[in-house]
């Protein structure tokens, strides 16, 4: 018990509960290891080695009070790179949304390695690390140009949602676009 006294106010007591416990700290989950393209069964279990690249430049309004890109902005960079990649293989996220379905990021893990500052040019690299019936797993890297310094590494899980926002299997018309892209990548 702590007793507080003073001349301006009457004495009062503050009692801390005796049953209070320190919170339990759970260990962080380790990075998941995936078998690539399990539902497509392509490439004999090899990863897609080609990255789709999008070049961008840091804008002043993306900076925080310390003069570096705010951490939350990197999620936008990753999502933009992913949308550009999907569009390059014939999947338009806006059209998917207008149809009532959605592609939603259900998990995003980012490892910040170095900062970006105003005016920096950089490239967002995106590839598919794995797919399942209802999910697509992406790997992202952000590299500062021109020296290719690694700024960020990220992993994203994207879920295909129906018009009631429930996870569903990726439609066969979309799945065929992944198959076409991966087969085309194999021949290059």
From Swiss-Prot:
Its EC number is 3.1.2.-. Acyl-ACP thioesterase involved in the production of fatty acids and beta-keto fatty acids. Can produce fatty acids of medium to long chain (6:0, 8:0, 10:0 and 16:1) and small amounts of medium to long chain beta-keto fatty acids (8:0, 14:0 and 16:1) when expressed in a heterologous organism (E.coli). Possesses thioesterase activity for lauroyl-ACP (12:0-ACP) in vitro. May play a role in the development of floral organs by generating short chain fatty acids. It is found in: Plastid, Chloroplast. It comes from Arabidopsis thaliana. GO terms for cellular component: chloroplast. Belongs to the 4-hydroxybenzoyl-CoA thioesterase family. GO terms for molecular function: fatty acyl-[ACP] hydrolase activity. Residues 1-47 form a transit peptide. The active site is at 64. This is Acyl-acyl carrier protein thioesterase ATL4, chloroplastic. One of its GO terms (biological process) is lipid metabolic process. Keywords: Chloroplast, Hydrolase, Lipid metabolism, Plastid, Transit peptide. It holds the Pfam family 4HBT_2. Expressed specifically in anther walls (endothecium) and in microspores. InterPro entries: 4-hydroxybenzoyl-CoA_TE (IPR050563), HotDog_dom_sf (IPR029069).
């Amino acid at each position: 018990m702590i007793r507080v006294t003073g001349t301006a106010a009457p004495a009062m007591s503050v009692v801390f509960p005796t049953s209070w416990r320190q919170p339990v700290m759970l260990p962080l989950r380790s990075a998941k290891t995936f078998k690539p393209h399990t539902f497509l069964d392509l490439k004999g279990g090899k990863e897609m080695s080609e990255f789709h690249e999008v070049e961008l430049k840091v804008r002043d309004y993306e900076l925080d009070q310390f003069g570096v890109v705010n951490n939350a902005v990197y999620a936008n960079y990753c999502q933009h790179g992913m949308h550009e990649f999907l569009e390059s293989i014939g999947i338009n996220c806006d059209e998917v949304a207008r149809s009532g379905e959605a592609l939603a990021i259900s998990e995003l893990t980012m490892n910040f390695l170095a900062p970006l500052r105003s005016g920096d040019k950089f490239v967002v690299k995106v590839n598919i690390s794995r797919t399942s019936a209802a999910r697509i797993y992406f790997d992202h890297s952000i590299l500062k140009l021109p020296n290719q310094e690694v700024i960020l590494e990220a992993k994203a899980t994207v879920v295909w949602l129906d018009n009631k926002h429930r996870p569903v299997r990726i439609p066969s018309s979309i799945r065929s676009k992944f198959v076409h892209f991966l087969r085309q990548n194999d021949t290059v």
